[in-house]
From Swiss-Prot:
ATP-binding is among the record's keywords: yes
NCBIfam families, A to Z: murD
Localization annotation: Cytoplasm
Gene that produces this protein: murD
Gene3D superfamilies: Mur ligase, C-terminal domain (3.90.190.20), Mur-like, catalytic domain (3.40.1190.10), NAD(P)-binding Rossmann-like Domain (3.40.50.720)
One of the GO BP terms on file: regulation of cell shape
Name used for this protein in its record: UDP-N-acetylmuramoylalanine--D-glutamate ligase
Protein family per UniProt: Belongs to the MurCDEF family.
Reaction catalysed by this enzyme: UDP-N-acetyl-alpha-D-muramoyl-L-alanine + D-glutamate + ATP = UDP-N-acetyl-alpha-D-muramoyl-L-alanyl-D-glutamate + ADP + phosphate + H(+)
Pathway: Cell wall biogenesis; peptidoglycan biosynthesis
Length: 461
């Protein structure tokens, strides 16, 4: 029997190990950590016939005792594809695969909708799964959100979940890079701005990874309102382009757009009013169009799509409205982990705004975000590891409003209560513009903490 080594006991690693075991592989898991929680997980996996080696770093020496019958090494998205150990293993003929690749092997007979982009992909994934399910189809979402692709494959393979009509998969650049075989029935590209450059090295490399997914997709859908995608349009000889800016954005024809009267339409007919989706912001009109194009491709009628859009509850941590504080609308936008996403969130809410931002800063162009701050923010409250860096950026840009700093989110919320009242703000917005890893497991944990902190302060309904 050949052996597969899975690296890492995160959600993707766990899913991959169980999926491979379900397929009768001899599976060993390497995990560099060793704590009580990992020991508990290790014991559970051992009972399932999966061996775990804790305290095992990703080095060539770690593999020495396991080379006999080694068929493949499977990694999760948190491990760089070009890690020196993986590069060396590949040069020695060892197959290195991403967790997403193992799931594709198991699930490729089911049509995939693969959704990628710097920003917008989570909202599109949630919204599209909702629309398809509301029309009576089985269309679970997973990948970069919710269940990992391998976990979904396990549940479908075991019969715990019914065989889906569609799989709605959010795909990050890390996942795409390590799964070059994934070829969706429908591919969606939401936006492209500089992100994860510390991992991919350049915008060109980052773009090429995402482009590969769309090139392999049977049907490719693009957001024509995105400046980078629009600039690359002439390099595509196929695809459906959507625009919230009318029929001819930048003098290029759109295939699906919102007209001057607020109607979603294509080249032959008006479909429905764009205001069926209650979520604020121009970016959500773009999301609506991408979802509509995909749903039409999947065989839904305009009426089915419109009915489903009316009932969409929104996405947790993405401009999620939590209530009001001293009359100001409170938004949890913890998913805004870079400057571009934070700029989009700030554009979407009513000013004057009290903004909470901070965390682990990323490379990127902050100019658009800073411009929105100058225009709409009455108070900027910075917290976490990146507070000093963000404060320097704001001062250098000439931000004219109140600027406060504190060590963590709890202090920021306390300051925000006073700032809302002091400035008679219309909105209070957590939109960090940073990753969460300085103080939180992920952006969801940060958003949940914000919800816990702000709930006691909210006005009574």
């Amino acid at each position: 029997m050949t052996r597969t080594i899975v690296v890492g006991l995160g959600r993707s690693g766990l899913g991959a190990a169980r999926l491979l075991k379900q397929q009768n592989h001899d599976v060993v898991v390497f995990e560099r950590g060793n704590n009580e929680a990992l020991q508990h997980t290790s014991k559970t996996l051992a009972e399932e016939g999966i061996q775990v080696v804790l305290g095992q770093p990703l080095t060539l020496q770690s593999f020495d005792a396991w080379r006999d019958n080694l068929d493949a090494v499977v990694i999760g998205p948190g491990i760089p594809w070009d890690h020196p150990t993986l590069v060396q293993l590949r040069s020695e003929g060892v197959q290195v695969r991403g967790e997403m690749d193992t799931a594709w092997d198991a699930l490729q007979q089911i049509p995939w909708i693969g959704i990628t982009g710097t920003n917008g992909k989570t909202t599109v994934t949630h919204l599209l799964s909702h629309v398809l399910e509301a029309a009576g189809l089985t269309a679970p979402m997973g990948g970069n959100i919710g269940l990992s692709a391998a976990e979904l494959a396990c549940q479908i393979g075991s019969g715990a979940k019914p065989r889906p009509d569609w799989l709605v998969m959010e795909l990050s650049s890390y996942q795409i890079e390590a799964a070059p075989a994934v070829a969706p029935k429908i591919g969606i590209w939401t936006t492209l701005t500089p992100d994860h450059l510390e991992r991919h090295g350049s915008l060109e490399a980052y773009r090429a990874i995402k482009r590969g997914l769309l090139e392999r997709s049977e049907c490719a859908l693009f957001n024509a309102d995105d400046p980078d995608l629009r600039q690359q349009r002439s390099s595509w000889n196929r695809g459906t382009w959507v625009s919230s800016e009318g029929a001819h954005p930048d003098n290029q024809p759109a295939d699906l757009w919102i007209d001057d009267e607020g109607m979603v339409r294509n080249n032959t007919t008006r479909l429905f009013a764009a205001d069926v989706l209650a979520m604020p912001g121009r970016h959500n009109r773009q999301n609506l169009l991408l979802v509509t194009a995909a749903a039409l491709e999947a065989g839904l009628s305009p009426q089915q799509i419109a009915d489903a859009l009316r009932t969409f509850p929104g996405v947790p941590h993405r401009l999620e409205q939590l209530g009001t504080l001293a009359g100001a609308s409170v938004f949890n936008d913890s998913k805004a982990t870079n400057y571009d996403a934070a700029e989009v969130g700030l554009r979407a809410v009513q000013g004057p705004v009290v903004v909470l931002a901070g965390g682990q800063t990323k490379q990127g162009d902050a100019s658009g975000w800073l411009k929105q701050l100058q225009s709409k923010a009455c108070s900027l409250i910075l917290f976490g590891a990146g507070a000093d860096e963000l404060a320097s950026l704001a001062k250098a840009a000439g931000y004219p409003g109140e600027l406060l700093q504190c060590p963590e989110l709890e202090s920021a919320v306390n300051l925000a209560e006073g700032a809302v009242q002091r400035h008679q703000a219309s909105s209070l917005l957590l939109s960090p513009a940073c990753a969460s890893f300085d103080q939180y497991r992920d952006f969801e944990a940060r958003g949940e903490h914000f919800r816990t902190l702000i709930n006691p302060l909210l006005d009574e309904a």
